[in-house]
Regions:
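A cross-family phosphate/adenosyl-ligand binding-site feature
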Residues: 2-9, 17-84, 88-89
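Hydrophobic/aromatic ligand-binding patch that stacks against planar heteroaromatic rings
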Residues: 115-119
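Glycine-rich phosphate/pyrophosphate-binding loops
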Residues: 120-142
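Electrostatically charged, flexible surface regions
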Residues: 141-252
Length: 252
């Protein structure tokens, strides 16, 4: 049986600890093509570069491993790889491992999820991995065995069209297990902190607090992470609200 071929990108940048831990973990079991931003692109979601050229640079190449940096967004990285750089069809596309939580509302802003979303849109099984720890020196060691297991299961499962998996790990030395769960409902509030520039107009930092809209719910990604479980959320890229669709058909 041939080794799996996996495309990897992220939004923290090609030098980030998370993506390099992922490379180290998967290198013994798979052939890897890594195309990641040349600097952090956190919060870029599914954005693309349309008004500037995109450049890439090959940083490392050996049998079974190619690593490239790209001046574009996480989605640009996936598009570049799929259009120009792959040497065979990837068995899986992975975003991550992200430094920080991408559960609940963060799903919509995440460049890590942007990688998985683009992979799914292009017809490939895709997953996003995130650890609830923003530190540059975050410890990813407890994730290793879970990552390998989840990668093999994701490849074996395939995935229905226009779906991907959002997988978040709590910050812990040991996990209680895995929970399959839905996305919690939340929103960011108090998002801008005003600062005074000594020579001119005010400026702002994006900060904020995450408001939980259903704190008592026990079937969500937020609950799973808060209680020490790995949260796996199947994500559907068809954003049609079919219940409302039927209501509107009767209304208009």
């Amino acid at each position: 049986m041939s080794r799996p071929y996996i495309l990897i990108s992220n939004d923290d940048g090609v030098q980030a600890r998370g993506i390099n831990f992922l490379i180290e973990t998967l290198r013994p079991i798979a052939d890897l093509l890594v195309v990641a931003p040349d600097s952090p692109r956190s919060g870029f979601g599914c954005s693309i570069t349309s008004a500037a050229p995109i450049h890439y640079k090959k940083l490392h190449e050996e049998p079974g491993l190619t690593v490239c940096s790209c001046t574009g967004t996480p989605v640009d990285c996936v598009k570049l790889a799929l259009n120009l750089l792959i040497d065979r069809r990837p068995d899986l596309i992975i975003g991550g491992i992200n430094h920080g939580d991408n559960s609940s509302v963060n799903t919509h802003y995440s460049g890590t999820m942007g990688v998985a979303t683009e992979g799914a849109l292009q017809g490939y099984p895709s997953v996003a991995f995130s650890l609830c720890d923003h530190r540059e020196d975050a410890d990813f060691t407890p994730l290793a065995s879970y990552i390998v297991d989840l990668v093999f299961k994701s490849i074996a499962l395939g995935m229905p069209p226009f779906t991907c998996l959002n997988i978040n790990f709590p910050k812990a030395n040991k996990f209680k297990g895995v929970r399959i769960c839905r996305m919690a409902h939340s929103r960011w509030q108090h998002e801008l902190a005003r600062r005074k520039h000594p020579y001119g107009a005010d400026y702002f930092w994006l900060v904020g607090d995450c408001e939980e809209l259903e704190p008592e719910a026990t079937d969500t990604d937020r609950w799973a992470l808060a209680h020490g479980y790995v949260a796996i959320t199947p994500t559907n890229l068809d954003v049609t609200d079919y219940e409302l669709l039927n209501v509107l058909k009767q209304t208009f």
